[in-house]
């Protein structure tokens, strides 16, 4: 690791010692209270060996009101190719969802990471942040797959919508292509954007379906906001009913909804009951053990590649009666999907 020493910063390269590293994170993350010296630790680690290996220490950090950033590097079940089941993380976001003060983000693009980090620092130490909301830990998944990073839109208002959407949990990344007569919605997180974006092209070209794309950076935050809305409505029966943010945003979209992630299906399913009524909600995730193979083979094995996104979207349209189920069978054949393959969860 190459770095430059500086009098106003510090880097600790601790090696394979997750418990020791968490101790350092806690010390730095609580120094605002114990020493009156605000610090903002960024702890970067193999995402598989964070919440799974040092969960007790992360809970302790939350309990004693630590502030800082945990960076789950080499994230995703299919992204760390060739490393096998001991290193391929498809569930740190599930474990992170159990810690109340952790905000668990799964960004896809560089501008999302930048917006999230800025928002986190402002929440922890910004002058306009309420005291009751300062004691938080931001967990960000970071992948090791290289791909071109899209720029923010040139329109300033739209660029701000992208940034604020990344922080609140989701935003519309791309409108449905013009031309197709049928409509659908695809949600992606992290590296799953590639399968989602390719599926949009395939659906438009071969199946007369225009799918809009939404980037979902934080299912946990969306769920918690929706739960707070439910609680308010329950305890204020005479007040005007409020609508959960995720329900309101998805109401702006059309058609069946497919969510694709490089993590377990349990991550997108956090918002399942808040999807607008009457909209089929399909989830593609990487439940099961990791295995050593290429990214392409792993994504086919876990059924989260482009072909499976297309099939899932068409199934949702068939559920609504908008297409015949023979079209689903056509897509299964087109993308050479084996319908009798063993469930990846069982392998």
Q: For each of these PLM feature ranges, what is it?
A:
Residues 1-15, 37-41, 179-182, 290-291:
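Glycine/charged-rich beta-loop-alpha catalytic/anionic-binding loops adjacent to active sites
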Residues 4-22, 43-51, 71-75, 81, ...:
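Active-site nucleophile and cofactor-binding loops and adjacent substrate-binding regions
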Residues 14-32, 267, 309:
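Conserved phosphate/anionic-ligand binding catalytic regions in large, soluble enzymes, centered on
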Residues 21-25, 41-45, 53-57, 61, ...:
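Extended, hydrophobic alpha-helical segments in both membrane/secreted and soluble proteins
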Residues 24-36, 59-65, 95-99, 271-274:
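Alpha-helix C-terminal capping segments
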Residues 34, 74-87, 91, 97, ...:
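Thiamine diphosphate
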Residues 39, 65-69, 100-102, 255:
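Short glycine-/polar-rich loops that comprise or flank the Walker A/P-loop
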Residues 59-77:
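A glycine-rich helix N-cap at a beta->alpha junction
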């Amino acid at each position: 690791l190459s770095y430059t020493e500086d009098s106003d910063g510090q880097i600790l390269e601790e090696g394979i010692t997750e418990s020791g590293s968490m101790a350092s994170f806690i010390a730095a993350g609580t120094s605002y209270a114990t020493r009156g010296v605000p610090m903002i630790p960024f702890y970067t680690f193999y995402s598989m060996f964070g919440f799974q290996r040092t969960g007790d220490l992360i809970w302790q950090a939350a309990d004693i009101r630590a502030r800082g950033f945990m960076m789950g590097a080499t994230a995703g079940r299919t992204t760390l190719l060739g490393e096998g089941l001991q290193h391929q993380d498809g569930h740190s976001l599930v474990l992170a969802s159990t810690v109340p003060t952790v905000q668990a983000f799964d960004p896809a693009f560089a501008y999302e990471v930048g917006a999230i980090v800025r928002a986190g620092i402002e929440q922890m130490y910004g002058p306009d942040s309420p005291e009751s909301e300062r004691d938080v830990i931001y967990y960000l998944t970071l992948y090791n797959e290289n791909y071109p990073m899209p720029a923010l839109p040139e329109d300033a208002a739209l660029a701000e919508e992208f940034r604020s959407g990344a922080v609140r949990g989701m935003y519309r990344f791309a409108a449905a292509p013009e031309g197709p007569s049928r409509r659908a919605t695809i949600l992606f997180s992290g590296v799953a954007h590639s399968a989602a974006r390719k599926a949009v092209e395939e659906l438009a070209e071969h199946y007369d379906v225009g799918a809009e794309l939404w980037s979902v950076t934080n299912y946990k935050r969306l769920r918690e906001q929706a739960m707070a809305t439910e609680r308010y409505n329950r305890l204020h029966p005479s007040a005007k009913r409020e609508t959960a943010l995720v329900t309101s945003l998805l109401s702006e979209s059309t058609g069946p909804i497919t969510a694709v992630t490089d993590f377990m299906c349990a991550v997108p399913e956090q918002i399942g009951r808040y999807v607008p009524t009457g909209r089929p909600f399909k989830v593609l995730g990487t439940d099961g053990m990791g295995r050593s193979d290429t990214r392409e083979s792993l994504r086919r094995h876990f059924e989260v590649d482009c072909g499976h996104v297309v099939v899932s979207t068409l199934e949702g349209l068939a559920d609504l009666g908008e297409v015949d189920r023979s079209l689903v069978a056509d897509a299964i054949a087109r993308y050479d999907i084996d319908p009798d393959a063993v469930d990846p969860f069982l392998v």
